[in-house]
């Protein structure tokens, strides 16, 4: 799930994927979903940690509103610590402003 610069609102292009994940979670309630929030390198470390957690919480809030139990969701914010693209340009930053979702037992 990707986010706009300095924003924790879900984008329209993420909603269908999140609805599909919601459906899977409701059908497989024995699993836990780990939601990892991330930010690009711009901003202070503290700000980016808070922003990345808000992004992860936005995903969690959407899934809970669609019927997934909050008991089955864990969230963590990593700030800028785990970039997928190490370059310092808009193309890289847009890839790093994200939330990643993992199914765990």
Which role does the model predict for each range below?
Residues 36-105:
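Periplasmic OmpA-like peptidoglycan-binding domain that tethers envelope proteins to the cell wall
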Residues 2-36, 57-70, 101-105:
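Periplasmic peptidoglycan-binding/anchoring modules of Gram-negative envelope and division proteins
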């Amino acid at each position: 799930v990707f986010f706009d610069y300095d924003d924790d609102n879900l984008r329209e292009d993420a909603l269908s994927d999140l609805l599909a994940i919601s459906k899977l979670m409701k059908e497989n309630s024995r699993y836990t979903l780990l939601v990892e929030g991330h930010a690009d390198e711009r901003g202070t470390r503290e700000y980016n940690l808070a922003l990345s957690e808000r992004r992860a919480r936005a995903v969690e809030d959407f899934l809970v509103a669609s019927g997934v139990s909050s008991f089955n969701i864990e969230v963590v914010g990593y700030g800028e610590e785990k970039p997928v693209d190490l370059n310092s340009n808009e193309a890289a930053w847009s890839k790093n402003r994200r939330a990643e979702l993992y199914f765990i037992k």
